[in-house]
Swiss-Prot record:
Temperature section of the record: Optimum temperature is 48 degrees Celsius.
pH and activity: Optimum pH is 6.8.
The encoding gene: apy
Catalytic center residues: D232
Record Pfam families: Fn3-like, Glyco_hydro_3, Glyco_hydro_3_C
EC number: 3.2.1.-
Subunit details: Homotetramer.
Enzyme class: hydrolase
Name listed for the protein in its UniProt record: Exo-alpha-(1->6)-L-arabinopyranosidase
InterPro entries: Alph_arabinopyran, Cellulose_deg_GH3, Fn3-like, Glyco_hydro_3_AS, Glyco_hydro_3_C, Glyco_hydro_3_C_sf, Glyco_hydro_3_N, Glyco_hydro_3_N_sf
Organism: Bifidobacterium longum
């Protein structure tokens, strides 16, 4: 079948059109084979292909799937700050989809990490929408470059697991636009994902699947989305209402196609709307035909494992390295002239790695190499003691005693600690930010026996570090590293490569410092997003709240210097930032240059600064590079509920260039013209608002002149009276000036009508 002969919605009966808007089974589209529309498979991601062995029969089984490369989940990959690497991960995922005849992989998920207790934080990217959008777009573009579709999810405001199927997320328009929408918006406008998955929850009272404002007004009409919207599994509660709202596909099927047929015949759904939704499904099938027509394809297992390996390396964040305890010396294996350190490895995670999150994204890896496996493969000697079990049972004194004795005889101790899967998974939120008590107790015992301790963490979202950090000279946050985490950790720990990861999420000192905790996880079926736009570092940095490790933070074996920071205006409200970053060490390494915009005086409360650009520079020892980062108009804008639009105010802004939100190398200023937006003045506009408006200012001057001439009552000019006057709507002037105030107000309205014509 050639593209010119692809079927169209015009070729289908009413019943066939209706059938396209529901799945064929749990993992297949419903095709119309007689009209040349196949029933392609769609299945889970987002950090690799999870094709259930039962999926061919349309059944659901989260535990038994075909082998696929398990890449680092977004919790780790987001710390790479490397969109090019993420694009390679996307390409590899697509190749595995082609082998398994999967037309659409369900991911990436770009919901904001509103609270670190969120059970699904492991598969989301960041607390910052700019970073989330500019990283996750690599997955979308990489996958779709190979002819396989993605499903950007979960649109929108799916930020907790508690009551996730029905909770009403009550969010202000500004918070939606500035925090919870931008990652979706950026990817839609720049990459056009072929599908978007709507969320389970309600937003301001309306389920996402039935939300016309969300799925049509915003997504399609404002952002220009031209793909299809599918429901999360079981999120469509009213097929007719959802189809009218802009939902193309319910998953899994409810076997109620006849309801759609009757709704069209009864005039509840227009034929044109059904045609639009059904044609979208045909278009999706047509986009994937070429890739799904490739037979006997086999992806390169080893090459994909190497992509996973590189991704894992760049996901590791070094939080602490006192006394340069890292890198360790592996001895003759790495350096024939070196004397090896005697190494103790303690912690079950070194033998049984936690490499991915739990739930619908659970993958069967093509291979799995633990840290202990890697040491054995590389001929690096180390003594091992598990120290604890990965269940929720109390500490085992025998395991603890063995671990302490092992530590006593070592030059350095590597302790693999973290969160077992039982406390962190899709389906529920965590109830504490703390590491399991038995692991902390073991760390304290080991540190008492040997002061040279390096902690290697395995967790899908941040944990509190401060209470136990004094017991470790080094700390590596390795998140969940996928199937090649063992080799990646060995490369970093033994100095084959410098760590380059940066935090995509702030690490607070205490969970109660998080601004969302006042309303977490909600009550009586709803959750208020009372922190508004002050999520994550936007809150911590604006209000000077101490954190353990700030957003964007990450250490290196190298040292860097950022110099020559400059900003050049490229338009009325756009600019380009340039800077030179130099590797001032003798170690090859990478540094991420981060650009934050500091607003000037504004009509609304704005965060102290916001990430609006970044670039990762790979530098040889002693090398320098000049980087350039463009700032578009949106980089300076906020969402104005007054204008129901983005708004850039005129004035001076500051541009910060640094290596974390709290490590700024230099700050430069730029003056913007503003977008010139004004709101029509009315009797309810305050006197101060009239003064600030271009037309209003002329009228205020005319009022003053008329007062001097005795034509109008003279306005009071003392400071006290001005204090009352400025915030006063002009229809209240009579309360201050009597009949004279009434005449002034009418004069102002009459003059405004003339000037604004």
């Amino acid at each position: 079948m050639s593209e010119s002969t692809y079927p169209s919605v015009k070729d289908l009966t009413l019943e066939e059109k209706a059938s396209l808007t529901s799945g064929g089974d749990a993992w297949h589209l419903q095709g119309v084979e007689s009209k040349g529309i196949p029933s392609y498979m769609i299945t889970d991601g987002p950090h690799g292909l999870r094709k259930s062995l039962a999926s061919s029969a349309g059944e659901t089984d989260l535990d038994d799937s075909v082998p696929a490369t398990c890449f680092p989940p977004a919790a780790g990959l987001s710390s790479s700050w490397n969109p090019e690497l993420i694009h390679k991960v996307g390409e590899a995922m697509a190749e595995e989809c082609i082998q398994e005849k999967v037309a659409v992989i369900l991911g990436p998920g770009v919901n904001i990490k509103r609270n670190p207790l969120g059970g699904r934080c492991f598969e989301y990217w960041s607390e910052d929408p700019y970073l989330a959008g500019h990283e996750a777009i690599g997955i979308v573009e990489g996958v779709q470059s190979k002819g396989v579709g993605t499903s950007l999810k979960h649109f929108a405001a799916n930020n907790q697991e508690t009551d996730r199927l029905r909770v009403d997320a009550r969010i202000s328009p500004r918070a939606l636009r500035e925090i919870y929408f931008p990652a979706f918006e950026h990817i839609v406008k720049k990459a056009q994902p072929w599908t978007i998955m709507c969320s389970y929850n309600r937003i301001n009272g309306v389920h996402s699947a039935q939300n016309h404002w969300l799925l049509t007004d915003v997504l399609r009409d404002e952002w220009g989305f031209d793909g299809i919207v599918m429901s999360d599994w079981g999120a469509d509660h009213d097929r007719g209402a959802s189809l009218n709202a802009g939902l193309n596909l319910e998953m899994p099927p409810s076997y109620t196609d006849d309801q759609i047929v009757y709704a069209v015949r009864d005039g509840l759904i227009t034929p044109a709307q059904l045609d639009r939704m059904a044609q979208g499904m045909i278009d999706l099938v047509n986009k994937t035909r070429a890739a799904m027509s490739i037979d006997n394809y086999r992806f390169d297992v080893d090459a994909h494992d190497e992509v996973a390996h590189q991704a894992a390396i760049e996901s590791i964040v070094m939080l602490k390295n006192d006394d340069a305890i890292l890198p360790l010396n592996a001895g003759p294996v790495a350096n024939p002239s070196a004397t090896p350190q005697k190494i103790a490895v303690i912690g079950e995670f070194a033998r049984t790695p936690r490499y991915q999150g739990g739930g619908s994204s659970h993958i069967t890896p093509t291979k799995m190499t633990s840290f202990l496996d890697t040491l054995a493969e590389r001929g690096i000697k180390a003594d091992f003691a598990p120290g604890f079990t990965l269940d929720l049972e109390p500490a085992d004194p025998a395991l603890e005693s063995e671990a302490v004795e092992t530590a006593k005889n070592a030059d350095v101790v590597l302790m693999f600690l973290g969160l077992p899967e039982a406390v962190e998974s899709e389906g529920f939120d965590r109830d504490t930010l703390d590491m399991p008590a038995k692991q902390i107790a073991l760390l304290e015992q080991v540190a008492a026996a040997n002061q040279n301790v390096v902690v290697v963490l395995s967790n899908g979202s941040v944990i509190t570090v401060a209470p136990w950090a004094k017991n470790a000279k080094g700390i590596l946050e390795s998140w969940l590293l996928g199937q090649s985490g063992g080799p990646a950790l060995a490369d970093v720990i033994f100095g084959q490569v410098s760590p380059s990861g940066k935090l995509a999420q702030s690490i607070p000192l205490d969970i109660n410092d998080d601004p969302s905790m006042l309303n977490w996880p909600g009550e009586e079926g709803h959750v208020d997003y009372g922190e508004g736009v002050f999520a994550g570092y936007r809150y911590y940095d604006t209000y000077g709240k101490a954190v353990d490790y700030p957003f964007g933070y990450g250490l290196s074996y190298a040292t860097f210097e950022i110099t020559g920071v400059a900003v050049a205006k490229t338009g009325a409200n756009t600019a380009t930032v340039t800077a030179t970053v130099t590797n001032t060490s003798d170690v090859d390494a990478a540094e991420t240059v981060q650009v934050y915009v500091v607003p000037g005086k504004a009509d609304v409360a704005r965060p102290k600064h916001e990430l609006k650009g970044f670039t990762k520079a790979f530098l040889k020892a002693g090398e320098s590079k000049t980087v350039a980062i463009d700032l578009d108009e949106r980089a300076f804008a906020y969402w104005s509920e007054k204008y129901n639009d983005w708004h850039v105010e005129a004035g001076e802004y500051a541009i910060e260039v640094g290596v974390s939100s709290r490590d700024i190398a230099d700050t430069v200023a730029v003056a913007l013209d503003g977008d010139g937006k004004t709101q029509p003045l009315t009797e309810w506009s305050t006197y101060g608002e009239w003064e600030a408006d271009p037309f209003g200012a002329k009228i205020v001057a005319a009022v003053a002149a008329a007062g001097e001439a005795g034509e109008l009552t003279k306005l009071p000019d003392n400071a006290m009276m001005r204090m009352f006057l400025n915030p006063m709507p002009i229809n209240s002037l009579p309360t201050l000036l009597g009949e004279g105030g009434k005449k002034i107000a009418q004069f102002m309205l009459d003059e405004y009508a003339k000037l604004s014509k």
